[in-house]
Structure formats: structure tokens, C-alpha cells
Amino acid sequence: MNKGELVDAVAEKASVTKKQADAVLTAALETIIEAVSSGDKVTLVGFGSFESRERKAREGRNPKTNEKMEIPATRVPAFSAGKLFREKVAPPKA
């Protein structure tokens, strides 16, 4: 499912126009990106959490020259699925 298909589904479920659904979805995504970029954690109960995590510096190799090189530490975005989301995707076995 791409963004256009998601907008269509949200518009239908919420009984709003596609333009309104697109505006709300775009605003929500931009807000999540801004919050995570500034170091905040965004938690949507039942769905999951968005946050940025520190990736440590490590040693790597240049694939062309096979020469060792230092890969610097960096921040990366991360998503952790909530319990309800995980259970919907993979129901617990009885």
C-alpha cells in the first residue's frame, strides 16, 4: 500500500474527502518526523513508537579497495511496533 492508497482508505473509513485525509495524514507524518528529528519519542498506544537511536561508530571496509575505514557514529530513525499491532500481524499461537 502506498500513500495514495492509504489516503483513499482513510478517507473512506473516516467519511471525509480524499483531500482532507491527505492533509491530515501529511500533517501527522510531518509532525512525527519533526518530533523524532528533535530527539523526542512519539508513542501511539497500540500502534507503536517512533524514536531516533544512536548507532555507534564502527570499523568497516571499503568494498572497492578492501581497505579498513572508520564508520562514524550517527543517529537513525527507529520504529517499535506496539503489542496490539504485533498481535494483529502475528496472532499468538494457542
UniProtKB/Swiss-Prot annotation:
Alphabetized SUPFAM superfamilies for the sequence: IHF-like DNA-binding proteins (SSF47729)
UniProt family annotation: Belongs to the bacterial histone-like protein family.
Gene Ontology CC annotations of this record: cytosol
Originating species: Nostoc sp. (strain PCC 7120 / SAG 25.82 / UTEX 2576)
Pfam family, one: Bac_DNA_binding
Cell inner membrane is among the record's keywords: no
InterPro entries the record matches: Hist_DNA-bd, Histone-like_DNA-bd_CS, IHF-like_DNA-bd_dom_sf
Subunit annotation: Homodimer.
Protein name per Swiss-Prot or TrEMBL: DNA-binding protein HU
Gene name per UniProt: hup
Top-level taxon of the source organism: Bacteria
Keywords from the named record: DNA condensation, DNA-binding, Heterocyst
